[in-house]
C-alpha cells in the first residue's frame, strides 16, 4: 500500500495540558511590571476554581490540527507513552483528521503532561519533556514542514531534520 502524501507535516512533542484555574493567589510585580511572580503560602492547601484537561496539544500538535482544519492533509511526527494519555492524544488527533502513523508509542514511557496554573489573565506552565529516542520516519517531502518544541535530548534529531530538509 502506498504511503499517503501529506501537504503539511508538523514535527515536535505532543502534550496533555491540565489548565488549573487558580482561585486565590497574590501577584508580586517589579515596579516596571516587567517581572511578576504568582505566590502561594508554602504548605497551604490552595483552592482552585476548575480544571480543564486538553489532550494532544503543544506547538506542533496545534499546528497539525490547525492545518487539517484549514483543509490541508496533515500529519504529526511525535512521541507518546504507552499510557492512557498517549492513547487519548492519538484518538484526539485522529478525530481532528491528523495523520498519526508517524507518532511513536514508547513502552514504559509516559506521555508529556504539563500543568498550567491559570490566574486572572495569565498563566505559568509546569513542564516536563520525557526523553524519547527521537527518530525521523520516512515520509514523502511535503510542501510544508513545521518544527517546534522538543525535549532537551533532541540536538542530533534537529540535525537529522535539517539534513532531510536540505536533501
Feature-to-residue mapping (PLM):
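Beta-strand->loop->alpha-helix junctions that form or flank phosphate-binding loops
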Residues: 78-82, 101-110
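Ribokinase/PfkB-type carbohydrate-kinase core domain
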Residues: 2-30, 52, 90-105, 117-167
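Glycine-rich phosphate/adenosyl-contacting loop at the front of the ribokinase-like
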Residues: 2-77, 87
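Conserved beta-strand and immediately adjacent loop positions that scaffold enzyme active sites
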Residues: 114
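Subtilisin-like peptidase catalytic core
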Residues: 81-84, 119
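Short C-terminal domain-edge/linker segments immediately following a structured domain
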Residues: 38-46, 107-109, 133-134, 156-158
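Short glycine/serine/threonine-rich phosphate/pyrophosphate-binding segments
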Residues: 59-62, 85, 110, 155-157
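Small/polar loops that bind or transfer phosphate-bearing groups
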Residues: 77-78, 149
Amino acid at each position: 500500500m502506498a504511503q499517503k502524501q501529506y501537504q503539511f507535516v508538523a514535527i515536535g512533542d505532543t502534550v496533555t495540558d491540565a489548565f488549573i484555574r487558580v482561585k486565590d493567589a497574590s501577584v508580586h510585580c517589579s515596579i516596571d511590571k516587567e517581572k511578576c511572580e504568582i505566590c502561594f503560602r508554602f504548605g497551604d492547601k490552595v483552592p482552585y476554581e476548575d480544571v480543564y484537561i486538553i489532550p494532544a496539544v503543544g506547538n506542533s500538535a496545534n499546528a497539525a490540527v490547525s492545518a487539517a482544519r484549514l483543509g490541508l492533509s496533515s500529519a504529526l511526527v511525535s512521541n507518546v507513552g504507552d499510557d492512557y494519555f498517549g492513547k487519548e492524544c492519538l484518538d484526539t488527533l485522529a478525530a481532528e483528521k491528523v495523520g498519526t502513523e508517524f507518532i511513536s508509542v514508547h513502552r514504559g514511557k509516559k506521555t508529556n503532561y504539563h500543568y498550567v496554573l491559570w490566574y486572572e489573565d495569565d498563566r505559568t506552565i509546569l513542564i516536563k519533556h520525557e526523553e524519547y529516542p527521537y527518530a525521523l520516519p520516512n515520509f514523502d517531502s511535503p510542501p510544508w514542514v513545521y518544527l517546534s518544541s522538543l525535549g532537551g535530548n533532541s540536538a542530533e534529531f534537529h540535525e537529522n531534520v535539517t539534513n532531510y530538509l536540505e536533501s
